[in-house]
Amino acid sequence: LYLMHGGWSNETSTLGTPERPSGFKNVIDNAIAQGDFAPLIIVCPTYNNTSGQDSADFSLALRLTRNYHNELVNNLIPAVESAFSTYAAGISADELMAARDHRAFGGFSMGSVTTWRTFEYALDYFRYFIPMSCGTSLDDESIWRAAEGRSQNDYFVMMMVGTSDFSYSYDTARAEDMRASAY
């Protein structure tokens, strides 16, 4: 699971660091220990360019999330999957794409924007997507077109948003649009 942070955050925001793990990391570790989750590798990347404050410039943050898939598929996935035991037979593009059934991408807020961009530009590398609380407009039709020619069973999207979240209207409209999409 590649799990992206939200705006004004970084790669340590969600799970913490080895020295200072977050409460969420402890929840995951305990769920695995109790058999509620199968063991998994969680990678917490960042779309930030040079600073965790890149999110302060909304247009820059959107540009960084739009381009992030390049670093993800060309550098990060090969680095992770060459260092850890995964389902990929190797790290060539074909081998990584062949293992997409065992890979998910999710993110919160601006990480959710990154999740939709990953769906749009790297669907060949991921089967599962977990966008959470995406409070902005995107070119949804362009995103859905990424699935053109694919069976609806070829990918799975689980959107999450709270009913009191400011992004509720964005996400419910996006979910309705996706259901109505030809893809």
Predicted region positions:
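Non-catalytic cap/lid and distal C-terminal segments of serine-dependent acyl enzymes
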Residues: 1-183
